[in-house]
Amino acid sequence: MRRSFLISAALGLSMSTPALAASIQSVLGYLRPTSHHHAPCADDVVLKQSAGSDSAAPDPLPSRVVHNWPNGTWIENISVRPNGNLLVSQSTPRGRVWQVKEPWLDEPKVELAYDFDEWVDRIIGIGETTPDKYVVVGSRFYSLDPQSSQVERTFCAMELDFTKGEKPSARLVARFPHANLLQSVSALPWDRSVVLISDQYLLHPRADWEDLTPGPGQIWRLDTKTGHHEIVMTNYAEMNTTYNHGLDVGINGIKIHGDHLYWINMDTGGAYRVRIDKYGYPTPLNAVPETLGVAEDALWDDFAMHGTRIGEESDDTTMFATSIVNLMAISPENGTIVPLAGVGTSEPMGFPGPTSAQFGRTEKDSHILYVTGKLFNVPPSIRDVVIQGWVRAIDTTGFHF
């Protein structure tokens, strides 16, 4: 993949972080790590021939648009309720969670579930804990502008509770003053009141590119009943920021499947896992993570897996991962990585800025992968980024490696 393509792809906010400036700067740093102030040039422009249609490329999986939000709305993460409704987190212009009801319908009803402005300005990750309760993470930001940065020491975890009716309640679970950039949330299958949360390293200040020592990514453990939280994993090379793809990247989406924690690293392009004990710690404590697959040009965001939803058992551990302008499947068994939508298929420009994915939970849509995104289209240049949130339904019927 051409580096000129990577730079514009990153305009899709390659990380799960809601900071457009950081995203652009990250890939600019990857392309030109010695340049502090570089104006966009012709090579920065992604022309359609850079990712033009390849007659030899596979067709994308069938898909349809479930819902589009207005321009300026950034949809970041997704969880699926037991009744099949989708909950999606909004990062801009406000920290909200939306509900998409009966997403298998042609025109599903979309309504605001909760506005978290009491505690945060933007929401990033959302994950189900006990049935129909969800932990969401976010922070204050300096402005509503998508290019704004988060205010340090303001990250927190909140709970969204649908167990008492269709009008949910919310509460603050815990503040994380020492977190860098909370990202993805995944509950322990055997104790769903406890979640693990990925925390992406952040270089401070962003303008200082002198010290490029790999920065540590980390995993927090949060007890949602007590609010107690602690770091349970850090300083794994497989979680770290290495500056291979720029600044402010590293570990991103996480999922727990069986007795393993799975994650993807936007910086290394790798997918990894490590065995965990009943408390969420790696076992043994000096365990070496297993590399499942690497796509060096992939800028991973989040992913879905079979068998990670409440009440389900499955040996299928295929990872369906979002990466800037495409959706890919990763086989943990042999490391095979194949494109399913967007770049790498016969319609490379058709999947702009995907952010996260989850499978449906009803008989109607258990084969459907719901994918969220935040770009109107794949921009022709860095001057033409249009943020627009969306949800699409990908039909995975018959997919196999």
Swiss-Prot record:
<feature type="glycosylation site" description="N-linked (GlcNAc...) asparagine">
    <location>
        <position position="77"/>
    </location>
</feature>
<dbReference type="GO" id="GO:0016853">
    <property type="term" value="F:isomerase activity"/>
</dbReference>
<keyword id="KW-0413">Isomerase</keyword>
<feature type="glycosylation site" description="N-linked (GlcNAc...) asparagine">
    <location>
        <position position="334"/>
    </location>
</feature>
<keyword id="KW-0325">Glycoprotein</keyword>
<dbReference type="InterPro" id="IPR052998">
    <property type="entry name" value="Hetero-Diels-Alderase-like"/>
</dbReference>
<keyword id="KW-0732">Signal</keyword>
<protein>
    <recommendedName>
        <fullName>Putative hetero-Diels-Alderase asR5</fullName>
        <ecNumber>5.5.-.-</ecNumber>
    </recommendedName>
</protein>
<comment type="pathway">
    <text>Secondary metabolite biosynthesis; terpenoid biosynthesis.</text>
</comment>
<feature type="signal peptide">
    <location>
        <begin position="1"/>
        <end position="21"/>
    </location>
</feature>
<comment type="similarity">
    <text>Belongs to the eupF Diels-Alderase family.</text>
</comment>
<feature type="glycosylation site" description="N-linked (GlcNAc...) asparagine">
    <location>
        <position position="71"/>
    </location>
</feature>
<feature type="glycosylation site" description="N-linked (GlcNAc...) asparagine">
    <location>
        <position position="240"/>
    </location>
</feature>
<comment type="function">
    <text>Putative hetero-Diels-Alderase; part of the gene cluster that mediates the biosynthesis of xenovulene A, an unusual meroterpenoid that has potent inhibitory effects on the human gamma-aminobutyrate A (GABAA) benzodiazepine receptor. The first step of xenovulene A biosynthesis is the biosynthesis of 3-methylorcinaldehyde performed by the non-reducing polyketide synthase aspks1. The salicylate hydroxylase asL1 then catalyzes the oxidative dearomatization of 3-methylorcinaldehyde to yield a dearomatized hydroxycyclohexadione.</text>
</comment>
<dbReference type="GO" id="GO:0016114">
    <property type="term" value="P:terpenoid biosynthetic process"/>
</dbReference>
<dbReference type="InterPro" id="IPR011042">
    <property type="entry name" value="6-blade_b-propeller_TolB-like"/>
</dbReference>
